Regions:
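Short hydrophobic beta-strand element within catalytic cores of glycosyltransferases
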Residues: 58-62, 68-72
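Nucleotide-activated donor-binding/catalytic signature segment of Leloir-type glycosyltransferases, i.e.
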Residues: 2-37
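Acidic donor-binding loop of glycosyltransferase active sites
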Residues: 40-54, 65-68
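Conserved acidic donor-binding segment of nucleotide-sugar-dependent glycosyltransferases
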Residues: 83-94, 102-107
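A charged, aromatic-enriched C-terminal amphipathic alpha-helix characteristic of glycosyltransferases
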Residues: 105-140
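Short glycine/proline-enriched, acidic/aromatic patches that form the donor-sugar handling elements
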Residues: 16-18, 35-36, 53-55, 75-80
Length: 147
């Protein structure tokens, strides 16, 4: 649909048969030495995870960088992200394409997701957020300290 958009695929130990998908607008990069460069040089983070437990680290990293996401339900698990408010959830191929294009073209939506994701990760997954949560837990059982 959009030959002006290039999909970059990252991942360590990428199998050779996956690399065969590379074409004009798909780049099979594989392992990325510096993730900072990856998150700063792309407009949308895509995580088509179909299985896995727990919070996905790369999803949280993209949130911390304020990089809007298109995810599966599995990739969004445990992050607090909500479809249409802080991310786009996609399952079918057409939903992925539409979601990526929407975030490329709609600057207001891109900004909204970037801000909402950044706020979410700071309040729920930062050191300060964790410290505040533990302080509240300790206070609730009478172990409050002023330090």
């Amino acid at each position: 649909k959009r030959p002006d958009i290039t999909l970059y695929v990252y991942g360590s130990n990428m199998p050779d048969d996956i690399k065969e998908f590379e074409c004009d607008n798909i780049r099979m990069v594989g392992f990325a030495e510096h993730l900072d460069d990856v998150f700063h040089n792309h407009r949308v983070f895509v995580a088509p995870l179909l299985s896995g437990a727990g919070i996905k680290g790369k999803v949280l990293e993209s949130m911390a960088y304020g990089l809007p996401t298109v995810l599966t339900d599995v990739a969004a698990e445990g992050t607090g992200l909500t479809h249409g408010i802080s991310t786009l959830i996609a399952e079918k191929a057409e939903e992925w394409v539409d979601g990526i294009i929407k975030l490329y073209d709609d600057e207001k939506l891109w900004q909204k997701f970037a801000e909402n994701q950044s706020t979410l990760v700071k309040s729920n997954f930062s050191f300060e957020g964790g410290k505040a949560a533990f302080k509240e837990i300790f206070a609730s059982v009478g172990l409050f300290t002023t330090r």
